[in-house]
């Protein structure tokens, strides 16, 4: 059994940017990117003899709190807190000559963002997206705005066969 817990209170004391030519401290409206306040994980591993071989089981649950992709919060690409569950089962033959394993990652098939890009207009102080008459964010790159999110891997299950000679 192993556990880990992480906490970081990352924030800007000052974040000065020029708004209409005037140096303005916008620290209250900025976030340290890719820095969750909380992270946690717990792993349970068990191994037992089976005949002359060995069987091992492991499972891990990990958590990451809300993450901002950029200094300016963006409701479209920032990631809310989420948990991932992984597990494995491995049989190892006598004397370690071979092993057979099954591994699962993101077993709940959680959809989560790992990064993203945004080229939409925002209020320079608060970072709130500026919406057009159609209710959609207005573009910072001409006629088309770009808002792209990249997602983590979906549920994956794999098997391994290892031979030692």
Task: Report each predicted region and the residues it spans.
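Amphipathic alpha-helical protein-interaction segments enriched in hydrophobic
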Residues: 57, 86-87
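Residues that define the transmembrane beta-barrel architecture of outer-membrane proteins
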Residues: 36-40, 81-85, 153-157
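Gram-negative outer-membrane beta-barrel transporters
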Residues: 1-71, 160-164
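Generic long, charged, amphipathic alpha-helical segments
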Residues: 72-73, 82
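Feature captures outer-membrane beta-barrel proteins of Gram-negative bacteria and organelles
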Residues: 40-42, 87-89, 124-126
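C-terminal beta-signal and adjacent terminal beta-strands/loops
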Residues: 62-70, 91-165
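Mobile, glycine-rich extracellular loop/lid and propeptide segments
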Residues: 44, 86, 96-99
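Outer-membrane beta-barrel proteins
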Residues: 26-32, 47-49, 75-77, 90, ...
């Amino acid at each position: 059994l192993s556990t880990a817990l992480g906490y970081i209170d990352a924030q800007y004391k000052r974040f000065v940017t020029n708004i209409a030519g005037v140096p303005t401290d916008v620290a209250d409206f900025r976030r340290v990117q890719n820095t969750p306040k909380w992270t946690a994980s717990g792993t349970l591993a068990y191994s037992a003899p089976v005949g002359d071989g060995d069987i091992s089981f492991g499972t891990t649950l990990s958590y990451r709190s809300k993450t901002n992709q950029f200094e300016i919060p963006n409701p479209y690409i920032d990631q809310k807190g989420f948990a991932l569950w992984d597990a494995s089962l491995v049989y190892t033959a006598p004397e370690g000559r071979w092993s057979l394993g099954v591994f699962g990652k993101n077993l709940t098939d959680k959809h989560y963002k790992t990064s993203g890009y945004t080229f939409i207009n925002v209020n320079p102080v608060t970072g709130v997206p500026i919406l057009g008459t159609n209710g959609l964010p207005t573009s910072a790159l001409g006629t088309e705005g770009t808002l792209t999110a990249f997602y983590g891997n979906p549920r994956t299950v794999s098997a391994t066969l290892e031979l030692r000679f």
